[in-house]
Amino acid sequence: MRKLSFLDRVIEELDSYARFTKVPLNPSKKSPSSDTIDGKLFEIEKKHSAGLMRVDYTGEICAQGLYRGQASVAKSPQTKEHLYHAAAEEYDHLAWCGERLQELGARPSLLNPFWYWTSFGIGAVAGSISDSLSYGFVVETEKQVMKHIDSHLKSLPVNDNRSREILKQMYIDESEHAVEAEKAGGKKLPKTVKAIMKLQSKVMTTLAYRF
């Protein structure tokens, strides 16, 4: 098999990002909300749900960028395969959130290109240092995503049953990803790095909810 050149990799990543921006996306698994019916939602409730789901959509965009950035420079074939597999599973989450946004009459965040490529860069830097550090970023990212999802489940309008089913399944999947990364040798991140990630996450969630 021919080894990909730097230009080949750039083209491959641009093509992958282009796929993420297409609506609708094509998940490998049907949405957990497929067989669920919403109760009556007032416009103000729809707007709030849309803001929350927009944040979750952007969170999945960040996960795609991080994992693909890490995979692009992974030291071992096993790590590369693990990260691309995780990205593929996160793609389903992205599709589910995108579909729900459409149902709510809303759009994804306008800042998603920035968040994707920023996350890709962070992933590439972490991955170039060591696989264990790369896995450590996966663990911390998943834990932060789980906290967001948990808070969103508590904040969703009572009658927003479809969004709730999506987030419940996402929480389960993210938990499994964190455990798998820890088992693969994820290195515990320094407190300073965790603090920076939390700050970045706070900025992202605040902006994505509104824009």
UniProtKB/Swiss-Prot annotation:
Record's catalysed reaction(s): a 5-methoxy-2-methyl-3-(all-trans-polyprenyl)benzene-1,4-diol + AH2 + O2 = a 3-demethylubiquinol + A + H2O
Lipid biosynthesis listed as a keyword: no
Keywords per UniProt: Cell membrane, Iron, Membrane, Metal-binding, Monooxygenase, Oxidoreductase, Ubiquinone biosynthesis
UniProt GO MF annotations: 3-demethoxyubiquinol 3-hydroxylase activity; metal ion binding
Gene Ontology CC terms: plasma membrane
Binding site for Fe cation 1: 60, 90, 93, 174
Protein name from the UniProt record: 3-demethoxyubiquinol 3-hydroxylase
Cofactor(s) the record lists: Fe cation
InterPro entries listed in its UniProt record: COQ7_proteobact, Ferritin-like, Ferritin-like_SF, Ubq_synth_Coq7
Topology in the lipid bilayer: Peripheral membrane protein
Source organism of the structure: Francisella tularensis subsp. holarctica (strain LVS)
NCBIfam families found in the cross-reference section: DMQ_monoox_COQ7
Cofactor details (free text): Binds 2 iron ions per subunit.
Pathway stated in the Swiss-Prot or TrEMBL entry: Cofactor biosynthesis; ubiquinone biosynthesis
Residues noted as binding Fe cation 2 in the record, renumbered to the chain: 90, 142, 174, 177
Chief location: membrane
Enzyme Commission number(s) of this protein: 1.14.99.60
Protein location: Cell membrane
Record lineage: Bacteria, Pseudomonadati, Pseudomonadota, Gammaproteobacteria, Thiotrichales
Cross-referenced CDD domains: DMQH (cd01042)
Pfam families noted in UniProt: COQ7 (PF03232)
Family in the record: Belongs to the COQ7 family.
GO biological process: ubiquinone biosynthetic process
Protein role: Catalyzes the hydroxylation of 2-nonaprenyl-3-methyl-6-methoxy-1,4-benzoquinol during ubiquinone biosynthesis.
Keyword flag DNA damage: no
